[in-house]
């Protein structure tokens, strides 16, 4: 029997393969042998959901030749068939998926057998997420989207954590770290203290010579890790010539001298992906140009060193929250925001590049900073879920750096498209 099967529901035509549905009586009992069509008087989304659950246990495809690219007239685009629906997409977009990279490397395709046996509805969701630049917000993804992102091996969400509900940051003991900064790692064979057998026993990497402010290293493991395993690994990893665990036990105050009880700081954050892999973010003490030694036999499948770029702060110390009654224009006295920071002995706030705002069920259209009645900065806002970003640099008002100090009389004004009762959370960087 041909591997392609057509399922005709009461509102959709769905394509799959016989190997996918061969053990499902609902489908096999209704196959028309002459046409290889299954007629079902049920909703197409229900059938698609059944197929998608079945597919979770199958390999992607046994042959990469089963794709139809014959309609591609533009060499920069490719035609792919997902569950019977054809997508004509830029190769640059598809190259972000390792699954499609393998397919696009092939040179010959069979025009008659062209199906990738996955849900076209889910793939369409993924493309929409990419188009809308929402692909990094994995916290909000449904399980079918997460499963297919893993299936297609989408590369750009690997290594990013979105733990804080507001923005693309993760939090360790009150410190909020930017998880979206570019990562860099390198094997440096020119360090004077390296022994020959170090390269046989360790994966060794250091930060970029252009940066002297690393914040944390990220380790991906091929299995679920218990806390005792993590503590054991911290003893085996070397930071320069010292086990990482010794830095944590003796130098925790180096993380932030403002902490009253530095010994209570947990020096790492752990999360587990749906596939069972564990990711550990090890927070660094302030070590200049650290050289990291990771044993090769502890199950690490990837590692990166994250550092603070010169142009972008990596730690946001504080946030300001305020409730507003029903209104479409929100005015925030930035002197009040500054008072929240006084306990940490900072005398002014610096807005660098972007100001982050979090508020549910509100659609802000633009924002202004006003000082003594004059507009200092005006900006539109970009939105992602309930999070807004104000770009403080534009052609009309240059606010790439704006200091808010005591008695400044500055106000932040936010304009929304309707009156709403809501809370607002602002996040600032100290200067």
From Swiss-Prot:
InterPro entries: SKP1/BTB/POZ_sf, T1-type_BTB. Gene3D superfamilies: Potassium Channel Kv1.1, Chain A. One of its GO terms (biological process) is protein homooligomerization. It comes from the Viruses. This is Uncharacterized protein R866.
